[in-house]
UniProtKB/Swiss-Prot annotation:
The keyword Transferase applies. It is an enzyme of class 2 (transferase). Uracil binds at residues 194, 199-201. The lineage of its organism: Bacteria, Bacillati, Bacillota, Clostridia, Eubacteriales. Its cofactor is Mg(2+). Binds 1 Mg(2+) ion per subunit. The magnesium is bound as Mg-PRPP. InterPro entries: PRibTrfase_dom, PRTase-like, Upp_B, UPRTase/APRTase, Ura_phspho_trans. It catalyses: UMP + diphosphate = 5-phospho-alpha-D-ribose 1-diphosphate + uracil. SUPFAM superfamilies: PRTase-like (SSF53271). This is Uracil phosphoribosyltransferase. Pathway: Pyrimidine metabolism; UMP biosynthesis via salvage pathway; UMP from uracil: step 1/1. Disulfide bonds: none annotated. GO terms for molecular function: GTP binding; magnesium ion binding; uracil phosphoribosyltransferase activity. Allosterically activated by GTP.
Length: 209
Protein backbone atom coordinates (compact mmCIF):
# COMPACT_ATOMS: atom_id res chain seq x y z
CA UNK A 1 0.00 0.00 0.00
CA UNK A 2 1.27 3.47 -0.84
CA UNK A 3 2.35 5.93 1.82
CA UNK A 4 0.27 8.99 2.64
CA UNK A 5 2.47 11.83 3.90
CA UNK A 6 0.83 14.95 5.34
CA UNK A 7 3.45 17.69 5.36
CA UNK A 8 2.58 19.75 8.43
CA UNK A 9 5.38 22.34 8.25
CA UNK A 10 4.25 25.59 9.94
CA UNK A 11 4.85 27.70 6.82
CA UNK A 12 2.74 25.36 4.70
CA UNK A 13 -0.06 25.31 7.25
CA UNK A 14 -0.01 29.11 7.55
CA UNK A 15 -0.26 29.61 3.80
CA UNK A 16 -2.92 26.92 3.54
CA UNK A 17 -5.08 28.81 6.05
CA UNK A 18 -5.01 31.85 3.76
CA UNK A 19 -5.98 30.01 0.57
CA UNK A 20 -8.84 28.32 2.40
CA UNK A 21 -10.28 31.75 3.24
CA UNK A 22 -13.13 32.57 0.84
CA UNK A 23 -12.07 36.24 0.78
CA UNK A 24 -8.59 35.54 -0.63
CA UNK A 25 -8.47 36.86 -4.21
CA UNK A 26 -7.04 35.15 -7.32
CA UNK A 27 -3.67 36.96 -7.30
CA UNK A 28 -2.83 36.05 -3.70
CA UNK A 29 -4.33 32.58 -4.16
CA UNK A 30 -2.06 31.88 -7.17
CA UNK A 31 1.03 33.13 -5.38
CA UNK A 32 0.35 31.03 -2.29
CA UNK A 33 -0.42 27.85 -4.24
CA UNK A 34 2.96 28.24 -5.97
CA UNK A 35 4.69 28.82 -2.64
CA UNK A 36 3.03 25.82 -1.00
CA UNK A 37 3.98 23.61 -3.95
CA UNK A 38 7.58 24.79 -3.69
CA UNK A 39 7.71 24.07 0.05
CA UNK A 40 6.15 20.63 -0.46
CA UNK A 41 8.75 19.86 -3.12
CA UNK A 42 11.51 20.00 -0.51
CA UNK A 43 9.95 17.02 1.26
CA UNK A 44 8.95 15.14 -1.87
CA UNK A 45 12.43 15.30 -3.41
CA UNK A 46 14.46 14.51 -0.28
CA UNK A 47 15.37 11.08 -1.68
CA UNK A 48 16.89 12.38 -4.93
CA UNK A 49 20.34 10.78 -5.35
CA UNK A 50 23.47 12.89 -4.89
CA UNK A 51 27.15 12.41 -5.62
CA UNK A 52 30.30 13.86 -4.12
CA UNK A 53 32.17 16.52 -6.10
CA UNK A 54 35.09 18.81 -5.39
CA UNK A 55 35.02 22.55 -6.07
CA UNK A 56 37.47 25.37 -5.54
CA UNK A 57 36.23 28.02 -3.13
CA UNK A 58 38.08 31.36 -2.88
CA UNK A 59 39.90 29.85 0.13
CA UNK A 60 40.48 26.14 -0.48
CA UNK A 61 39.22 23.01 -2.18
CA UNK A 62 35.90 21.70 -0.78
CA UNK A 63 34.05 18.42 -1.00
CA UNK A 64 30.38 18.98 -1.76
CA UNK A 65 27.32 17.06 -2.86
CA UNK A 66 25.33 17.62 -6.04
CA UNK A 67 22.33 15.96 -7.62
CA UNK A 68 23.48 12.83 -9.40
CA UNK A 69 21.77 13.37 -12.73
CA UNK A 70 18.27 12.32 -11.67
CA UNK A 71 15.68 13.35 -14.24
CA UNK A 72 12.48 14.90 -12.92
CA UNK A 73 9.14 15.24 -14.69
CA UNK A 74 6.17 17.35 -13.60
CA UNK A 75 2.70 16.40 -14.82
CA UNK A 76 -0.05 18.83 -13.82
CA UNK A 77 -3.64 17.70 -14.30
CA UNK A 78 -5.41 20.53 -16.13
CA UNK A 79 -6.37 23.04 -15.28
CA UNK A 80 -5.83 23.49 -11.55
CA UNK A 81 -2.57 21.54 -11.53
CA UNK A 82 -0.96 24.35 -13.53
CA UNK A 83 -0.98 26.45 -10.39
CA UNK A 84 1.62 24.19 -8.76
CA UNK A 85 4.14 24.01 -11.61
CA UNK A 86 6.11 27.24 -11.33
CA UNK A 87 6.89 26.85 -7.65
CA UNK A 88 8.54 23.47 -8.26
CA UNK A 89 10.32 24.66 -11.41
CA UNK A 90 11.90 27.44 -9.38
CA UNK A 91 13.67 24.72 -7.38
CA UNK A 92 14.33 22.30 -10.24
CA UNK A 93 14.37 24.33 -13.47
CA UNK A 94 15.54 21.45 -15.67
CA UNK A 95 12.42 19.36 -15.01
CA UNK A 96 10.33 18.47 -18.06
CA UNK A 97 6.63 19.33 -17.89
CA UNK A 98 3.86 17.23 -19.39
CA UNK A 99 0.13 17.95 -19.31
CA UNK A 100 -3.00 15.84 -18.95
CA UNK A 101 -6.47 17.25 -19.55
CA UNK A 102 -9.59 15.45 -18.34
CA UNK A 103 -13.26 16.33 -17.97
CA UNK A 104 -16.06 14.45 -16.26
CA UNK A 105 -18.72 13.03 -18.57
CA UNK A 106 -22.06 14.41 -17.32
CA UNK A 107 -23.88 11.13 -18.01
CA UNK A 108 -21.40 8.51 -16.81
CA UNK A 109 -19.55 10.81 -14.35
CA UNK A 110 -16.33 9.15 -15.51
CA UNK A 111 -13.23 11.13 -16.55
CA UNK A 112 -12.68 11.59 -20.29
CA UNK A 113 -9.28 12.54 -21.71
CA UNK A 114 -9.22 15.59 -23.97
CA UNK A 115 -5.50 16.42 -23.95
CA UNK A 116 -2.27 14.56 -23.24
CA UNK A 117 1.28 15.66 -23.97
CA UNK A 118 3.97 13.90 -21.94
CA UNK A 119 7.78 13.68 -22.11
CA UNK A 120 8.90 10.81 -24.34
CA UNK A 121 11.28 9.41 -21.71
CA UNK A 122 8.78 8.89 -18.87
CA UNK A 123 10.40 5.63 -17.82
CA UNK A 124 13.69 7.41 -17.13
CA UNK A 125 12.21 10.10 -14.90
CA UNK A 126 10.88 10.46 -11.39
CA UNK A 127 7.42 11.87 -12.00
CA UNK A 128 5.47 14.27 -9.81
CA UNK A 129 1.76 14.37 -10.66
CA UNK A 130 0.23 17.67 -9.55
CA UNK A 131 -3.39 18.36 -8.63
CA UNK A 132 -4.35 20.76 -5.82
CA UNK A 133 -7.50 18.85 -4.84
CA UNK A 134 -7.90 15.08 -4.48
CA UNK A 135 -11.67 14.66 -4.14
CA UNK A 136 -13.18 11.46 -5.56
CA UNK A 137 -9.85 10.46 -7.08
CA UNK A 138 -11.37 9.71 -10.48
CA UNK A 139 -9.26 12.14 -12.50
CA UNK A 140 -6.07 11.25 -10.66
CA UNK A 141 -6.59 7.50 -11.10
CA UNK A 142 -7.30 8.00 -14.83
CA UNK A 143 -4.19 10.16 -15.16
CA UNK A 144 -2.01 7.59 -13.41
CA UNK A 145 -3.43 4.88 -15.69
CA UNK A 146 -2.47 6.95 -18.72
CA UNK A 147 1.02 7.76 -17.42
CA UNK A 148 1.75 4.10 -16.74
CA UNK A 149 0.49 3.08 -20.19
CA UNK A 150 3.06 5.46 -21.66
CA UNK A 151 5.91 4.00 -19.61
CA UNK A 152 5.91 5.98 -16.37
CA UNK A 153 7.00 3.92 -13.37
CA UNK A 154 8.39 6.05 -10.55
CA UNK A 155 5.48 8.30 -9.66
CA UNK A 156 4.54 10.48 -6.70
CA UNK A 157 1.30 12.40 -6.28
CA UNK A 158 1.26 15.94 -4.84
CA UNK A 159 -2.02 17.49 -3.70
CA UNK A 160 -2.70 20.41 -1.41
CA UNK A 161 -5.89 19.02 0.09
CA UNK A 162 -7.46 15.55 -0.10
CA UNK A 163 -10.60 13.79 1.05
CA UNK A 164 -10.30 10.28 2.53
CA UNK A 165 -12.42 8.93 -0.35
CA UNK A 166 -9.92 10.16 -2.93
CA UNK A 167 -6.93 8.82 -1.02
CA UNK A 168 -8.58 5.41 -0.79
CA UNK A 169 -9.40 5.38 -4.51
CA UNK A 170 -5.79 6.13 -5.47
CA UNK A 171 -4.35 3.61 -3.03
CA UNK A 172 -6.63 0.86 -4.31
CA UNK A 173 -5.92 1.55 -7.99
CA UNK A 174 -2.22 2.47 -7.67
CA UNK A 175 -0.72 1.11 -4.45
CA UNK A 176 2.79 1.91 -5.70
CA UNK A 177 2.18 5.69 -5.87
CA UNK A 178 2.99 7.62 -2.69
CA UNK A 179 0.67 10.53 -1.89
CA UNK A 180 1.92 13.83 -0.45
CA UNK A 181 -0.59 16.28 1.03
CA UNK A 182 -0.66 19.59 2.86
CA UNK A 183 -3.94 18.56 4.53
CA UNK A 184 -6.25 15.55 4.75
CA UNK A 185 -9.77 16.89 5.21
CA UNK A 186 -12.94 15.35 6.64
CA UNK A 187 -15.05 14.10 3.73
CA UNK A 188 -16.82 14.83 0.45
CA UNK A 189 -20.24 16.47 0.39
CA UNK A 190 -23.12 15.44 -1.88
CA UNK A 191 -21.65 17.53 -4.72
CA UNK A 192 -18.23 15.81 -4.42
CA UNK A 193 -16.59 18.91 -2.94
CA UNK A 194 -14.01 18.43 -0.19
CA UNK A 195 -15.22 19.55 3.25
CA UNK A 196 -14.02 21.98 4.53
CA UNK A 197 -11.70 22.26 1.51
CA UNK A 198 -11.23 25.57 -0.28
CA UNK A 199 -13.85 25.50 -3.03
CA UNK A 200 -13.01 25.02 -6.72
CA UNK A 201 -9.23 25.43 -7.00
CA UNK A 202 -9.33 26.08 -10.76
CA UNK A 203 -11.91 28.84 -10.44
CA UNK A 204 -10.01 30.46 -7.60
CA UNK A 205 -6.68 30.26 -9.43
CA UNK A 206 -7.96 31.78 -12.64
CA UNK A 207 -10.75 34.02 -11.38
CA UNK A 208 -13.48 32.26 -13.34
CA UNK A 209 -16.08 31.97 -10.62
Amino acid sequence: MSRVVVIDHPLIQHKLSIIRDKDTGPKEFRELVNEIAMLMAYEVTRDLPTEEVEVDTPIARARCRRLAGEKLGLIPILRAGLGMVQGILSLYPTARVGHIGLYRDPDTLKPVEYYCKLPTDLGERELLVLDPMLATGGSVVASLDLIKRQGGRRIKLLCLIAAPEGVQAVQEAHPDVDIYLAALDEMLNEHAYIVPGLGDAGDRLFGTK
